[in-house]
UniProtKB/Swiss-Prot annotation:
Belongs to the eukaryotic ribosomal protein eL43 family. GO terms for biological process: translation. GO terms for molecular function: structural constituent of ribosome; zinc ion binding. This is Large ribosomal subunit protein eL43y. A zinc finger (C4-type) spans 39-60. Keywords: Metal-binding, Ribonucleoprotein, Ribosomal protein, Zinc, Zinc-finger. The lineage of its organism: Eukaryota, Viridiplantae, Streptophyta, Embryophyta, Tracheophyta. PANTHER family: 60S RIBOSOMAL PROTEIN L37A, LARGE RIBOSOMAL SUBUNIT PROTEIN EL43. Gene3D superfamilies: 2.20.25.30. It comes from Arabidopsis thaliana. GO terms for cellular component: cytosol; cytosolic large ribosomal subunit.
Length: 92
């Protein structure tokens, strides 16, 4: 059986190339890109990356635009919280 990676995980495919710090950055991106996310439409963990910035739920079939490597970008979270806060100010 082939030897498995212990520390490097998904970036073991790069071997010793590109340097350790760059491989750590890439590992963070690739782990988030391949993980499953929570679907806000059906309530299940079924959202996976289809292409760059396109995320689709395998359970309900909904497709959502998001970030390249994560489903929600930092700026999108900021905008969503600002809109929520402004709505609450208007209502009450």
């Amino acid at each position: 059986m082939a030897k498995r990676t212990k520390k490097v995980g998904i970036v073991g495919k790069y071997g010793t190339r590109y340097g350790a710090s760059i491989r750590k950055q890439i590992k963070k991106m690739e782990v988030s890109q391949h993980s499953k996310y929570f679907c806000e439409f059906c309530g299940k963990y079924g959202v996976k990356r289809k292409a760059v910035g396109i995320w689709g739920c395998k359970d309900c079939g909904k497709v959502k635009a998001g970030g390249a490597y994560t489903m929600n970008t930092a700026s999108a979270v900021t905008v969503r919280s600002t809109i929520r806060r402004l709505r609450e100010q208007i209502e009450g």
